[in-house]
């Protein structure tokens, strides 16, 4: 049973990569995927022997294999042993991070390296069946570069909504708190006071952010802050949200219970 489950996920990943390739090639022929099983998330049922028709990079119809007619030139993909389901969504990711990024070793990881780590993780995420993700916090806008490369068809990966650097108070969860004073190290998203947080929101949007990420409390992996303590004031938070909404962006808040 375990082996069959793993095989299903590999097939799902393969189908995701196929769809990603189709998106980049709008002139591709019509694709008909014949699946042994299809998870219908609306009804909560698993349907058998279903055909998925893809035209111009979009799914245009789904129905029983016996009822879907094919034509000369169609690309037929036979997956009789596979279970196909809609692409999964992960609303909290950091694709530009890995084991090499955490703690003091992470201080040696450059922004270009962050982007390359992101390319590796983007492919793995797509192959795991996730076709849309929200990346909430990345140094140097490496997530923006990754999103743009995926959208341009240069590398495989899911659709990405990205925040750029997360906003933080000085010494907060998303500041750089590992180095001593003489290095004057500061996180990319640090901003204190109403005028400063408004500027940071606008700066993130200027450089390509789809949303704004805010570290509203301390965290368990940052040094010197309390995970239970509020960091931004209510007035600062209101200023962040108001400016982001005025500019057509949503705000994602990171907080501990």
Language-model-derived ranges and their functions:
Residues 1-7:
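N-terminal secretory signal peptides that target proteins for export/translocation
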Residues 8-21:
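Bacterial N-terminal signal peptides
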Residues 22-26:
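Boundary at the C-terminal end of the N-terminal hydrophobic targeting segment
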Residues 36, 52, 57, 81, ...:
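Divalent metal-coordination and catalytic microenvironments
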Residues 38, 44-85:
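Histidine-rich, glycine-flanked metal-binding segment
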Residues 82-154, 170-173, 177-180, 235, ...:
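Metal-associated gating/positioning segment near the N- to mid-region
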Residues 145, 196-257:
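Histidine/acidic residue-rich metal-binding segments in metalloenzymes
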Residues 159-162, 166-179, 206:
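Surface-exposed loop and adjacent secondary-structure segments within mature catalytic domains
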């Amino acid at each position: 049973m375990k082996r069959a489950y793993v095989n299903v996920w590999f097939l799902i990943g393969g189908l995701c990569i196929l769809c990603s390739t189709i998106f980049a090639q709008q002139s591709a022929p019509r694709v008909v995927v014949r699946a042994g099983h299809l998870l219908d998330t609306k009804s909560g049922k698993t349907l058998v022997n279903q055909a998925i028709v893809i035209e111009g990079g979009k799914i245009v119809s789904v129905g029983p294999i016996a009822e879907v007619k094919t034509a000369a030139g169609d690309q037929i993909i036979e997956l009789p042993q596979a279970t196909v389901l809609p692409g999964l969504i992960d609303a909290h990711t950091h694709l530009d991070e890995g084991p090499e990024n955490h703690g003091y070793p992470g201080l040696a990881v450059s922004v270009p390296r962050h982007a390359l780590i992101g390319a590796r993780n983007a492919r793995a995420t797509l192959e795991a069946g996730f076709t849309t993700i929200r990346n909430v916090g990345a140094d140097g806008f490496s997530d923006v570069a990754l999103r743009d490369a995926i959208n341009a068809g240069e590398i495989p990966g899911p659709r990405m909504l990205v925040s750029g650097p997360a906003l933080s108070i000085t010494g907060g969860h998303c500041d750089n708190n590992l180095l001593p004073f003489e290095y004057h190290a500061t996180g990319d998203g640090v901003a204190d006071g109403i005028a400063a947080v408004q500027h940071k929101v606008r700066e993130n949007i200027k450089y390509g952010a789809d949303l704004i990420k805010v570290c509203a409390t301390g965290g368990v992996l940052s040094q010197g802050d309390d995970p239970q303590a509020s960091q931004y004031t209510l007035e600062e938070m209101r200023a962040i949200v108001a400016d982001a909404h005025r500019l057509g962006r949503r705000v994602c808040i990171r907080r501990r219970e």
